[in-house]
Amino acid sequence: MVPERGADPRKIIHVDMDAFYASVEQRDNPELRGKPLAVGGAAARGVVAAASYEARAFGVRSAMPSVTAKRKCPELIFVPPRFDVYRAVSAQIRDVFAEHTDLIEPLSLDEAYLDVTQNRLNISSATTIAEMIRAKILEVTGLTASAGISYNKFLAKMASDQNKPNGQFVITPRHGPAFVETLPVNKFHGVGPATAAKMEALGIETGADLKERSLSFLQQHFGKSGLWYYQIARAIDERAVDPDRPRKSIGAEDTFAADIVDLETSLAELKPLVAKVWGYCEGKGIRGRTVTLKIKFADFQQITRSRTVAVPIELSDFEHLAADLLGSVFPVRKGIRLLGVTLSSLGDVLPPDQRQLRFEL
């Protein structure tokens, strides 16, 4: 397939640090190396923010309740997060990127897209640039990174997962469509468990199956996302690497295998969603003022509840507001199928003496 619109193929790299938070902790504390490690709180209501590869071997994952993680891996070691350290290391990594290009789109502290079609060192091979970047990151930080190289962002992201940890993978324009066709849809970036399950119920299990469906079929079943699925099934992604991409909100949601009808279970499911959103906020050094709760019931009716405060909130306020919003809809007459929480009205972190929760009247 010829790259988008007949243009010369772009050269996009997706760099993803390997188990970033956990790797920083193992780097700084030799006693933790080679051991199953979770960054997060070990308390009964704690949540795993990140897991080392040793912990992942036991099934421990980020956003997992700490009690569940400990059950899966009794020898799991918990350490509290040090976001100031992670941000400092991320700045070092960003400096390495800047040696090659200004077109850097950070996704979080530990991953970013780079467009190296034109680059500072005039190196024609994106594969070579990725190797140089990974080697320099290791030299500067003592940490390993993986990379995906391709001609668009979707494929570069998918490629970076292929040779983790400490590896890289290339998807060329010639091989892009075939790569997508063989990939299970539940491995597609941006296709969550609920969407993958819906696709599989429609007989769509691979990229090839997805490609067989018409645009109208996909839009009928997936709404506005149908066009996106139609394009990525054909290895098409025309999104530019955007260094100035504004983030208007940060959210997380989950669809449940069985409908939830009680408040206690709903609050337990809300906790890791709040933790996931907060982890991103900590990583970016930002806060928000508006908390929005989203609920989709078993009959697909959807409701939202929101609350805005005068100044950017801290984690305890976020947890409290989200729980209050959830409690306000109970008791419910029908089961909850999906739960989501979003933080918006984003801004930089305020000085500590200004972080008092003041509700708007």
UniProtKB/Swiss-Prot annotation:
Record flagged with keyword Transport: no
Co-factor binding comment: Binds 2 magnesium ions per subunit.
Residues engaged in binding Mg(2+): 16, 110
EC number: 2.7.7.7
Keywords, alphabetical: Cytoplasm, DNA damage, DNA repair, DNA replication, DNA-binding, DNA-directed DNA polymerase, Magnesium, Metal-binding, Mutator protein, Nucleotidyltransferase, Plasmid, Transferase
GO molecular function, one term: magnesium ion binding
Chain segments annotated as coiled-coil in the UniProt record: none
Site feature location: Substrate discrimination: 21
Cross-referenced Pfam families: IMS, IMS_C, IMS_HHH
Localization of this protein: Cytoplasm
NCBIfam families referenced in this protein's UniProt entry, alphabetically: PRK02406.1
PANTHER family tied to this protein: DNA POLYMERASE KAPPA, DNA REPAIR POLYMERASE UMUC / TRANSFERASE FAMILY MEMBER
The protein's name in its UniProt record: DNA polymerase IV 3
Organism name: Mesorhizobium japonicum (strain LMG 29417 / CECT 9101 / MAFF 303099) (Mesorhizobium loti (strain MAFF 303099))
Originating gene: dinB3
